[in-house]
Amino acid sequence: MIAHKQKKAKKKRVWASGQLSAAITTSEMGLKSVSSNSIFDPEYIKELVNDIRKFSHVLLYLKEAILSDCFKEVIHIRLDELLHMSKHQNLNSVDLQNAAETLASKVKAVNFTEVNDENKNDLFREVFSSIETLAFTFGNILTNFLMGDVGNDSILRLPISRESKSFENISMDSVDLPHEKGNFSPIELDNLLLKNSDSIELALSYAKTWSKYTKNIVSWVEKKLNLELESTRNIVKLAEATRSSIGIQEFMPLQSLFTNALLNDIHSSHLLQQTIAALQANKFVQPLLGRKNEMEKQRKEIKELWKQQQNKLLETETALKKAKLLCMQRQDEYEKAKSSMFRAEEEQLSSSVGLGKNLNKLLEKRRRLEEEALQKVEEANEHYKVCVTNVEERRNDLENTKREILTQLRTLVFQCDLTLKAVTVNLFHMQQLQAASLANSLQSLCDSAKLYDPGQEYSEFVKATSSSELEEKVDGNVNKQIASSPQTSGYEPADSLEDVARLPDSCHKLEEDRCSNSADMTGPSFIRSWKFGMFSDSESTGGSSESRSLDSESISPGDFHRKLPRTPSSGTMSSADDLDEREPPSPSEAGPNSLGTFKKTLMSKAALTHKFRKLRSPTKCRDCEGIVMFPGVECEECLLVCHRKCLENLVIVCGHQKLQGKMHIFGAEFIQVAKKEPDGIPFVLKICASEIESRALCLQGIYRVCGNKIKTEKLCQALENGMHLVDISEFSSHDICDVLKLYLRQLPEPFILFRLYKEFIDLAKEIQHVNEEQEAKKDSPEDKKHPHVSIEINRILLRSKDLLRQLPASNFNSLHYLIVHLKRVVDHAEENKMNSKNLGVIFGPTLIRPRPTTAPVTISSLAEYSSQARVVEFLITYAQKIFDGSLQPQAGVIANTGAIAPQVDHGCHPKPLLSPDERDSDHSLKQLFFSSKEDIRTMDCESKTFELTTSFEESERKQNALGKCDAPILDNKVHLLFDQELESASHKTEDTCKSPKLLLLRSDRVANSVQRPTPRTRLRPVSLPVDRLLLLAGSPTERSSRNTGNTDSDKFGKNAAFEGLHRKDNSNTTCSKVNGFDQQNVQKSWDKQNERNSFTAKTTVIIPSAYAEKGLAVSTGNNRGHSSGAAQPSKAHADPARSARDTSEHSSSDSCPVAAVRAPRTLQPQHWTTFYKPPNPTFNVRGTEEKTAFPSAAVPPVLVHAPQSHVAKSDPDLEATLACPVQTSGQPKESSEEPGLPEGTPTCQRPRLKRMQQFEDLEDEIPQFV
């Protein structure tokens, strides 16, 4: 049924379209008659005047409606009356239609809710101007019509409306069908469709057909535009090649004309490309596709809505049918019950008296059944009525929905037609403009070609060749001009016998013609002398010189100096023709960047720093790592090789020296990269971190958002090829972050070594425990009244410092640099949304990970990820307290010859997080975090001296144990006396050693008045491996000696307060070998003297004045204690009940000697306790083991500073005298730490005091402060 109606509608549309075409034809025929005869018809003129007067009145009514504060509907009605003035089709032109559309858009754009007396003139200014424009346009069109100047192009070919009464359609009104006269209004269209039962399906099918139709149109336009675009590109290439070929050929007929034609082709092709781009963008394709997609979307929604409404109506109709059947069934049941009741009554009347009682019961039962049946009938009738009401409501709803859908579809179709009309006008209008410009240019070329006289150029050529008397003069002028021209200086002058001389006037004329006709030619402009017999057959027949090699010499065997000029590449030749290194570059090519023939090649910023030349031999490209054959270039300075096509993406800057080979960085051993840097920090870390800090600290999601994988791999490859010379400014910040994370992730062993993994995981658990305690206590009023840094946090800080000092110098410096960089990222967390917790999650598994194994992943190993993140978060949060802004130098930087390693580039060091003033203002808080391993380090190994220092450790510990009340007074006196002696001694050391001046680490002069805790001199037991027990049993200096070598001297200060505070352990440290002086010989002599000279508890040291005159500075202090002054040997296993927390607290409070100078060394435990095998002693070791022991408490502290030259020449008696006093109790022999191990030969062994245990117990009762 639907298909049949669609066929009928199609037949009607075909018939209507044929009638419309006939109407248009009749209209076109009538226009001529109107233009010729209607003007002289008095009746038509009278009617026209009346219509014009009515049009002016409508304009006035519209203006008055706007000025008289009418409602919006009134203004729109007036505007609608104005726009429907379409009676005279001869006056309905494009300009008038555009003016009317402009007026309508201006009126609709006014927001009438905001109109008042104040802003009325401003809001309606554009409307009034549009009304005046419409009136002016109408007047012009009317004048042209009356004057007979109306053109057919300006008249719109619109369908003739019912109101259009003119001579060409009067006869047609009598034959048109009633329902086909003119255009229907939108309401009439909807009413017509409502009469049809299948109106929704017809409208939806039309919308679907419109979508398919539009799809085909868009497909045709897109394919056509693509073909035209490809054609224009080929035309441009062909025109460029042809123009460059015919441009060098002179005296050719119509040469300028064809050159202009080629230029016109190029210009028109460029215009066509712009037109195609516009049509593909917002002029045709995109708007039409958008409208089609919207049509499809709304059509599907409308279809779904219509199906839902139909299903609802079907459900209600089904319910109505069921209700009707139920009513009929109930009625039948009621009739049966009623007849049964009637029979029962009859039986009762005819029955005897004895059966009356039973019949009464039966009668009552049947009466009850009859009533129930009647009740069911009434209920069924009520349900039926409800169903009937529901069906009526559904039908009304369906009718309303049908009307709304038809209105929506009609509006949608109108909008789609409007869009299709607009884009179609754009399409043909732009094509018309393109064709018009092309037609004009072709017409001008045709006119120019008609003016050419055949043989004109040949005559000019003959005249030029026959003027032999002026050959030398012209040849000299030409050669002079060639030599002076900067664009042709690369070409040698031709021989005079082969040159074709021309007259000066013809020369100038030719030069002017070439400049005017070939102004846009690419390549050098030059004056070329003709040579006879120099054309090959292929050139003369083919018409192009591209088939020959433009780099080759002349074809003539006798012409060794002439070279053909090189034409630029047209896209079809090899790109190697521009790389002729046999020709010296011209002055114009030898610019500041020395681009030469690469001016047309796209280059990156890094590529512009190179000075390229043609590649001499095949090799590998540094950019893409492909094989470079002939189309390759090579830098003259750094010898970088790459393809020409890779110059656009090159990121390696010229280093003006030979570029190093490729270095495998990602996945390589860390020490391989670190040993090539002065400070041990990989250049990848420094480059990436500095670039991120310069432009991406406020970038949201830094280090969290992933970058482009291809660009990241490109940057990794460039860093391996160019190392420090890579310019990473062209890459995005996320790509740089990915490179940094990838480098850290691919390290075989992270910055925090595998052997320290367990300690850091335990540290993370302590951090978690402390955080939980702080969370529980942060709301208590006591903490709010007395805010202070938790002692547990301070202890964790000191333990973390102790663990970090066990890292090698390069690992420590790299970790230091990275953590400080991440701290700066966290400082901008408000902008980048990356706090320390987020960064800990990202960098935790990268910086701290266990040794890889083949064991399967367990839940415990997964749970350690949070611990890894927590440690990194803690390091970032307390970076100011853990790292102090300076880096450790690498170990082993001094060679056997005493040469000093290159200085560390301080520009690469992390910037200090606080200024000195801020440090001083915050000094009261940071005093709690001083650690001997952090604040006291050795000086540079290139110093020419060593210092032998002692301390008041035993006396201070005795004072703290005997009386806490006298501790501050004694401490102040001892420190004041000792500081004065140290200052005088250190000044002498400066003069002797000529070492760099030491800077102040802190400048707090009131530190002497603060009571300082006494550090322990013994170790508490802890559950660690044997080698770690040996490491912890030694002094802090001994534990960290392998990590510290020559350190930047700017880190240390001479503040007397802190020197007195930290001088509690003294040790003898020397460089292994400086200026040929071997420290091991002195150590052996000291050991021998130690064996012979064993001092008791009351031994004193007497140094003659003769030795002081030789350069020894002696400072003697008074010892105030005698009862328990003996040194206490270290007992690693003395008290197994002590906890690991006390152990870490004790080890963190150990101290080191101040400014002790020695070479870095490696701790070598006894070989029978571990698997470690001690290496053979060489002169390259960082230092020898120090075997020190403390004398009795009665010995006054002695500070000796002696130059190496004096020590080397000192007497044996002096060595014997200095042997034992310089040994400290804080550094006992390793063999004495393990009671169960074989004992070596001890040096200056002392008996254990009887009251040792008492002092230890008393010391435990004294509160310890960090």
From Swiss-Prot:
F-BAR domain location: 187-457
Zn-finger (Phorbol-ester/DAG-type) residues: 609-654
Site-annotated residues for Arginine finger: R704
Bias (Low complexity): 538-556
Region feature Disordered, mapped onto this chain: 538-596, 1033-1054, 1114-1153, 1222-1248
Record's compositionally biased regions (Basic and acidic residues): 1132-1148
InterPro entries: AH/BAR_dom_sf, C1-like_sf, F_BAR, GMIP/FCHO2-like_FCH, PE/DAG-bd, RHG29_45_N, Rho_GTPase_activation_prot, RhoGAP
UniProt keyword annotations, A-Z: Coiled coil, GTPase activation, Metal-binding, Phosphoprotein, Zinc, Zinc-finger
Sites of Phosphoserine modification: S166, S171, S174, S185, S496, S516, S549, S915, S951, S1023, S1149, S1151
SUPFAM superfamilies: BAR/IMD domain-like, Cysteine-rich domain, GTPase activation domain, GAP
Coiled-coil ranges (or none): 291-413
Domain named Rho-GAP: residues: 668-883
Pfam family, one: RhoGAP
Alphabetized GO MF terms: GTPase activator activity; PDZ domain binding; zinc ion binding
UniProt-listed SMART domains: C1, RhoGAP
UniProt subunit comment: Interacts with PTPN13/PTPL1. Interacts with RAP2A via its coiled coil domain. Interacts with RASIP1.
Record-given protein name: Rho GTPase-activating protein 29
Natural source organism: Rattus norvegicus
